[in-house]
Amino acid sequence: MTKLTVRGLQVALASKNIVSNIDLEVSVGQWTCIIGPNGAGKSSLLKALAGIIPSTGEILIDGANMRDLSHRDRACWIAYVAQEPVMPTGMRVFDYVLLGRTAHLKMLATESPKDLEITHYVISELDLVEFIDRDIATLSGGERQRVAIARALTQASPIILLDEPTTALDVGYQQEVLELIDKLRNEKKIAVISTMHDLTVSGLYPDRLLLLAQGHVVASGSAESVLTPENIAQHYGAKVSVINHASGPVVIPERNN
């Protein structure tokens, strides 16, 4: 069973620690969501786990050092979607999503019927069929975000890192994307680590929340144990009510006057 293990992870920028002493363990089939105020280090943590920015400490995949892997091998293990994905212009949506299969191809090989089948499946599940021949440059922000997520899911890596995957999406597409990720992590046994700003949504699908503040984990556990008025007041500076619902805690901002 694939497992991502992180021990004592630190990320420094200009000699200042922006992520400090992070310990984390996520197995396939599990979903951990990282929350926290702006500047807490959420995106930096995900970039470090993806190997995009330098870090110290251990990042292990099934006990093997991730930093020893080639870029191709790393892509077979980990898929990453940035908060604002950079996409090439002049490329069709289908061809971009198909790039997710590149890590699985042998040298000089072309995509197999299975690769094409996987790509068509993900495009269909994310309601992108009508855009299949569109140039990526012509898409809206929300459409581009769904296409980026589709490429990552087509990659079929056992670990997927999603930085604010639903920020540019309306509520209908938010639900569609999160439902598909939840379905695949259960059916295909994928380990998911995401960041989210919407506290209510963060408690709907993940098994575990990590609350980050000033680069440190200040709370972790179930949504019910982390999403408390006290935690939110202390680390977000916000006055809220939290209502228990069958789907998870509902966080409602309160007026101060």
PLM region spans:
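Conserved ABC transporter NBD signature motif
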Residues: 57-65, 74
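Conserved ABC ATPase signature
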Residues: 135-139, 143
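Conserved ABC ATPase "signature" region
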Residues: 113-131
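Catalytic Walker B motif of ABC-type/P-loop ATPase nucleotide-binding domains
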Residues: 160-164
